[in-house]
Swiss-Prot record:
Cellular component, GO annotation: mitochondrial inner membrane
Described function: Mitochondrial transporter that mediates uptake of thiamine pyrophosphate (ThPP) into mitochondria.
First and last residues of every Solcar repeat: 15-102, 115-200, 206-293
Main location: mitochondrion
UniProt-listed GO biological process terms: mitochondrial thiamine pyrophosphate transmembrane transport; thiamine pyrophosphate transmembrane transport
Keyword NAD tagged: no
PANTHER family in the cross-refs: SOLUTE CARRIER FAMILY 25
Designated name of the protein: Mitochondrial thiamine pyrophosphate carrier 1
One Pfam short name: Mito_carr
InterPro entries reported in the protein's UniProt record: Mit_carrier, Mitochondrial_sb/sol_carrier, Mt_carrier_dom_sf
Length: 301
């Protein structure tokens, strides 16, 4: 057995866009299947408005959700979310492969030698921007479906029609700017943290699931730094539904600070880390494993 498992995300890794797209889609689908309920709870926490006598805890939200909407409500918005994760995973890792090669060429042309971690930070930011542009409508749709507190489940097509009817085509991209900032920052920091963790774990490559452990650390680190941007993104996605007219991201940011304080930017932080860290762990592990498996099949053929 090799003492060092291959890191397919490291600077200089020879991964084709097609390989990365397929492995990334598999990783996205599997990670979503395990973390859907945590995502629902996290978004409900983030969307709590000011005005409750008592802020609802995670336990209270879960209890109310099960009593009033049934256990299936934990998977509200899961169909668009599964599509989102499959698309996002494929586009994220596929674009990562393409951008990584482009950045490496620029480094060679301008005689720059970035560390593997800093290389991954830049590439990750780029892949986050591309992935957000492609998959954002599904992210918004997921948020709208999860925010629905009626026992009956809204349909995807019905929700899309309502958004277009009430808000126009632009409504499908409500909150895209803070989303771009949030996702690109989180993605860049995740890949940066992952590469740092992989470098520090060089002497522990025989540890089972070392990729998942490094992915868990990366997910927790990136989310801890960028969580306020994620809250702002969710509020922007819901503002036109709640208030009937669009607000700018800066207006919503100031309103949160004024009415809820800094704490308002961190609503749902605990459950978010509990969801994001395992998601990153599963996603990065499955990407590495799926890519190795795809290559083994090709060798056998």
């Amino acid at each position: 057995m090799s003492t060092k498992r291959e890191d397919h995300l490291r600077k200089g890794a020879d991964v084709t866009p097609t390989e990365a797209l397929v492995a990334g889609s598999i990783a996205g689908a599997i990670s979503r299947a395990f973390t859907a309920p945590l995502d629902t709870i996290k978004i409900r926490l983030q969307l709590q408005p000011k005005g409750f006598k008592h802020r609802k805890s995670v336990v209270t939200i879960v209890k109310n959700l099960l009593e009033n909407e049934g256990i299936i409500a934990l998977w509200k918005g899961n169909v668009p979310a599964e599509i989102l994760y499959i698309l996002y995973g494929g586009v994220q890792f596929g674009s990562y492969s393409i951008i990584s090669k482009s950045v490496s060429k620029l480094e060679n042309n301008y005689r720059i030698n970035l560390s593997s971690a800093n290389h991954s930070l830049i590439v990750g930011i780029g892949s986050g921007i591309v992935s957000t542009l492609v998959t954002y409508p599904f992210d918004l749709l997921r948020t709208r479906l999860i925010a629905n507190k009626n026992r009956g489940l809204l349909s995807m097509t019905g929700t899309i029609k309502d958004i277009i009817k009430l808000e126009g085509i632009r409504g499908i991209y409500a909150g895209i700017r803070p989303a771009m900032l949030s996702v690109s920052s989180t993605t860049g920091l995740m890949f940066w943290s992952y590469e740092l963790a992989r470098e520090l774990s060089n002497n522990y490559q025989r540890v089972p699931f070392i990729e998942a452990i490094c992915g868990f650390i990366a997910g927790a680190t990136s989310k801890g730094i960028t969580f306020p941007l994620d809250t702002l993104r969710k509020r922007c996605q819901m503002c036109s539904v709640v208030h009937g007219r669009p607000y700018t991201a800066s207006h919503i940011f100031v309103t949160i600070l004024k009415n809820e304080g800094v704490f308002g930017l961190y609503k749902g932080f605990g459950i978010s880390v509990l969801k994001t860290a395992p998601t990153s762990a599963i996603s990065l592990f499955m990407y590495e494993y799926s890519l190795s498996f795809i290559r083994k099949i090709r060798v056998i053929e």
